[in-house]
Amino acid sequence: MQGSVTEFLKPRLVDIEQISSTHAKVTLEPLERGFGHTLGNALRRILLSSMPGCAVTEVEIEGVLHEYSTKEGVQEDILEILLNLKGLAVRVAEGKDEVFITLNKSGSGPVVAGDITHDGDVEIANPEHVICHLTDDNAEIAMRIKVERGRGYVPASARIHTEEDERPIGRLLVDATYSPVDKIAYAVEAARVEQRTDLDKLVIDMETNGTLEPEEAIRRAATILAEQLDAFVDLRDVRVPEEKEEKPEFDPILLRPVDDLELTVRSANCLKAEAIHYIGDLVQRTEVELLKTPNLGKKSLTEIKDVLASRGLSLGMRLENWPPASIAED
């Protein structure tokens, strides 16, 4: 029993009922009241949608150009064959993200997963799975199948746009169901510890496709859940700070020399005599100040005002922190 009223009970693995090699019931108890549904629903969702595995993603069938066709001597049409290939349970050695396997069969009778030719890195978990039927002794079928590692469910339509430019005619895409879990359900029953009768017992009933044992699937799902919850333990901000683009302190045009204004020689010389070297120096002067400049009359003043106006500037502007360090150093 827990040491204090604030201490949570921790579940322990009570029973694993192995119904078959692909079907098992796992029971966990005791759980605090309400935790049966909390944990059961979280594990169920992960097991259904987020478990990694391997699946058929592409197939090339000799003599077939598209999925809306049939093949002579084969009972099923191509769409049915693709649907049957989705049910292929394949285990690929760790470290390999994709492999190719081949199928060549002739003669009347069913074509099953066990007829597939593959190397030691591939294992077919359901060799009796039917892919199609050949209808006569002269019928034959040959195909090259691509198996990839992934997670969850990825429909063929989601890969069409990304692979359209590279996919040759005759290479057929297959909806990929990577999850090794076929069925998953959970039930919450009453549990008791000493005098407490308000506890939960979680019973997980699961079937896999044979590429992963049910017990191992639950372990992996629990690991995924724990890793996702780690971020909530200390709630640190792990966002990478965005690099803000530094805006220039002054408009670049203000840093250009007054010579760039292409004033008349008379006006330019008058400004240089007053130590007005940059446009930023000029725009801070007023009309009155410029008219006090020797040899600079109203005609030159009008010229300066017009040239500045054409660049969106004017006399009498106030520039804080002028001059900038780059100019001051010069």
Swiss-Prot record:
Gene3D superfamilies with a match to the protein in the record: 5' to 3' exonuclease, C-terminal subdomain, DNA-directed RNA polymerase, insert domain, RNA polymerase, RBP11-like subunit
One matching Pfam family: RNA_pol_A_bac
First-tier enzyme category under EC: transferase
The UniProt record lists the keyword Repeat: no
Chain positions covered by the region annotation Alpha C-terminal domain (alpha-CTD): 250-330
Transcription among keywords: yes
Reactions this protein catalyses: RNA(n) + a ribonucleoside 5'-triphosphate = RNA(n+1) + diphosphate
Cited InterPro entries: DNA-dir_RNA_pol_insert, DNA-dir_RNA_pol_RpoA/D/Rpb3, DNA-dir_RpoA, RBP11-like, RNAP_asu_C, RNApol_insert_sf
UniProt-listed SMART domains: RPOLD
Recorded domain comment: The N-terminal domain is essential for RNAP assembly and basal transcription, whereas the C-terminal domain is involved in interaction with transcriptional regulators and with upstream promoter elements.
General function of this protein: DNA-dependent RNA polymerase catalyzes the transcription of DNA into RNA using the four ribonucleoside triphosphates as substrates.
Quaternary structure and partners: Homodimer. The RNAP catalytic core consists of 2 alpha, 1 beta, 1 beta' and 1 omega subunit. When a sigma factor is associated with the core the holoenzyme is formed, which can initiate transcription.
Protein name according to UniProt: DNA-directed RNA polymerase subunit alpha
Species per Swiss-Prot/TrEMBL record: Vibrio vulnificus (strain YJ016)
